[in-house]
């Protein structure tokens, strides 16, 4: 579990009571924080090995689920160090089965094969082995469990959901009409309901729409026929999260507009399609003009739900050297590129961070 909210709400007591009634033995591990830490994962692996755990129930949001996946990998692969899976030095051959009771709509980890862990010693935030071994066996989605979330966390979650589809949507290849249509409808649904939740945090219908959108946005559905997606914004944000511990969705909002303006000219028609089909912006013969209008519309949405559109608004006033260091880390010390819509090298990454400042 994460912090104390699931305890205060009585959810943990309800779960443990049900387990006892069914005669199921259990142990608990709490204290998972946003941008979940490798040290907590190692603690969980040691606990599971000591107590001979054979199933993990993740009660929380993305950080709790991602930690559970990494713990599951570590227990099922005792001859490997779990961080080696994040560094791609090793590949897991299994994972403890995982179930989810979701309390935060955001990451989509309840239906995904992804997990992200932060090494607090090296300030690195890395994906931990993308395999179907860690995909949860079941997930219980009750929108009422999200009523008590603070507004900032709710809206950060909505941005994360949007970005999981947008990262797959903005590719520079021929895509499938059905996938595009699903993606565009999902984005419209999230935008519409995120605005409702600003005024009505206990609106069940809006919470339900957002919660289901979160699962559909990251289970692979919106990536069919897109070649896997771009993911540059996530890579750029991972460095912000790893070094400065920012909220993931808010970090994505702060970066996205600068990334979009930096790359849109590679394929302005794709951005124009986004503008027209998501924001109903008329598309004339000038795709670039329509594309920029769509980028501005998305940034205006971020502002309308009080999400940042710059690093300064995110609470980061970074020096040129700090931005250079972020790009150096994101490029794995100038040894890799990121993105597929436009491949970005270290210099490109630095320019986007500077634009976002």
Give each language-model segment a name.
Residues 7-79, 196-207:
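N-terminal small/polar loop signature for handling phosphorylated ligands or for N-terminal nucleophile
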Residues 32-36, 63, 71-75, 89, ...:
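Acidic, glycine-rich active-site loops and adjacent beta-strand->loop/helix elements
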Residues 42, 135-139, 227-234:
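Acidic-glycine-rich active-site phosphate/pyrophosphate-binding loop
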Residues 50, 68-76, 92, 223-225, ...:
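Alpha-helix C-terminal capping segments
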Residues 77-175, 273:
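A glycine/threonine-rich phosphate-anchoring loop and its flanking beta-alpha core
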Residues 133, 271, 278, 282-357:
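C-terminal charged capping/lid subdomain of soluble metabolic enzymes
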Residues 168-297:
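Active-site segments that bind and position negatively charged phosphate/pyrophosphate groups
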């Amino acid at each position: 579990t994460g912090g104390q909210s699931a305890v205060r709400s009585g959810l943990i007591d309800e779960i443990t009571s049900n387990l006892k009634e069914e005669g199921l033995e259990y142990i608990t591990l709490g204290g998972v924080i946003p941008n979940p830490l490798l040290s907590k994962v190692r603690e969980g692996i040691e606990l599971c090995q000591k107590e001979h755990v054979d199933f993990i129930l993740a009660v929380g949001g993305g950080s709790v689920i991602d930690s559970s996946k990494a713990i599951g990998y570590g227990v099922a692969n005792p001859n490997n160090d779990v961080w080696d899976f994040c560094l791609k030095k090793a590949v897991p051959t299994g994972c403890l089965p995982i179930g989810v009771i979701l309390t935060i709509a955001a990451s989509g980890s309840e239906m995904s094969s992804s997990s992200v862990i932060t090494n607090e010693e090296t300030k690195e935030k890395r994906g931990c082995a993308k395999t179907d071994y860690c995909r949860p066996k079941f997930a219980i989605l009750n929108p009422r469990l999200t009523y008590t979330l603070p507004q900032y966390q709710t809206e950060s979650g909505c941005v994360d959901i949007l970005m999981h589809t947008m990262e797959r949507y903005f590719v520079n290849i021929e895509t499938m009409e059905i996938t595009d249509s699903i993606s565009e409808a999902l984005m419209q649904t999230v935008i519409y309901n995120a605005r409702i939740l600003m005024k009505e945090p206990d609106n069940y219908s809006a919470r339900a729409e957002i919660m289901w959108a979160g699962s559909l946005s990251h289970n692979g559905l919106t990536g069919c026929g897109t070649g896997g997606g771009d993911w540059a914004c996530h890579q750029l944000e991972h460095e912000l999260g790893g070094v400065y511990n920012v909220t993931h969705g808010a970090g994505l909002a702060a970066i996205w507009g600068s990334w979009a303006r930096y790359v849109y000219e590679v394929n302005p028609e794709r951005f124009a399609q986004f503008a027209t089909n998501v924001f109903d912006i008329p598309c004339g013969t000038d795709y670039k003009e329509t594309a920029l209008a769509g980028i501005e519309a998305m940034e205006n949405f971020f502002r309308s739900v009080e999400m940042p559109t710059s690093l300064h608004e995110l609470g980061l006033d970074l020096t040129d050297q700090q931005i250079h260091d972020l790009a150096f880390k994101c490029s794995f010390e100038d040894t890799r590129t990121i993105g597929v819509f436009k491949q970005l090298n270290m210099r490109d990454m630095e320019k986007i961070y500077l634009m976002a400042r």
